[in-house]
Curated annotation (Swiss-Prot):
Example of a GO cellular component annotation carried by this entry: ribonucleoprotein complex
Purpose: Located on the platform of the 30S subunit, it bridges several disparate RNA helices of the 16S rRNA. Forms part of the Shine-Dalgarno cleft in the 70S ribosome.
Name the UniProt record assigns to this protein: Small ribosomal subunit protein uS11
Subunit organization: Part of the 30S ribosomal subunit. Interacts with proteins S7 and S18. Binds to IF-3.
UniProt GO BP: translation
Similarity section: Belongs to the universal ribosomal protein uS11 family.
An annotated Gene Ontology molecular function: structural constituent of ribosome
Amino acid sequence: MAKVPSRSPRKRVRKQVADGMAHIHASFNNTIITITDRQGNALSWATSGGSGFRGSRKSTPFAAQVAAERAGTAAQDYGVKNLEVFVKGPGPGRESAIRALNSVGYKITNITDVTPIPHNGCRPPKKRRV
């Protein structure tokens, strides 16, 4: 039987990124935080639903805070120190996600609101009658 040359397991070297971007998508139902490098390649991400919150608790500011802390600690393995924050959406987790990223230890250099605003595009959904 022929011997198969064994490959020694090589440890994957993570690229070191000093500056990153945090994209916070805060909808009424969930909050998604993605931390990327300057080119937009995702380093880490977390959601309120993936952090253990289900149903109406996903849309709370505390759930957004927990998700931002999880995404922030995962991105620290890449050496990210400074973050530029882009916030999209009207959800309740906007402010608390930014505060959580600050408390993890990131220096926030810029906060930009990139919420899409229609120039009278699609017709909005009808108003709720409760």
